């Protein structure tokens, strides 16, 4: 989300060193990461995997994933969540039901609230 701004700032301030957290070369939109930038990325899929695995091991079988925007970090987390949940379900010999949705924003609104309430009501019946 901030890649273009980082590329601009790195060009404007070549003597300044920038550290960009959760930014990749693809986010920057240039052929290479500027020499005065250091990009650090998390392995979101690993955190997501552990979350999905743990919730199924805790006995939950009706799950939901709501990602804000479908940006690479959120997508990786979501995929990890599904993979972890599936791995735990296979170990337990059980079936799971996962609702999966991207809200297209990083804030709530009436439409997202309604969808989440629908998921909750579906899981209670």
Go through the PLM ranges and name each one.
Residues 1-125:
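A residue-level marker of the well-folded mature domains of exported/periplasmic proteins
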């Amino acid at each position: 989300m901030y890649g273009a701004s980082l590329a601009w700032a790195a060009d404007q301030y070549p003597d300044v060193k920038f550290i960009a957290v959760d930014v990749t070369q693809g986010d920057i939109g240039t052929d290479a990461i500027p020499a005065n930038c250091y990009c650090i990325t998390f392995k979101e899929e690993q955190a997501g995997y552990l979350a999905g695995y743990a919730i199924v091991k805790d006995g939950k079988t009706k799950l939901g994933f709501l990602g804000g925007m479908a940006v690479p970090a959120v997508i990786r987390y979501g995929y990890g969540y599904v993979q972890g949940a599936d791995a735990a379900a296979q170990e337990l010999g059980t079936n799971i039901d996962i609702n999966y949705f991207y809200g297209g924003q990083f804030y709530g609104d009436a439409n997202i609230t309604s969808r989440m309430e629908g998921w909750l009501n579906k899981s209670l019946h």
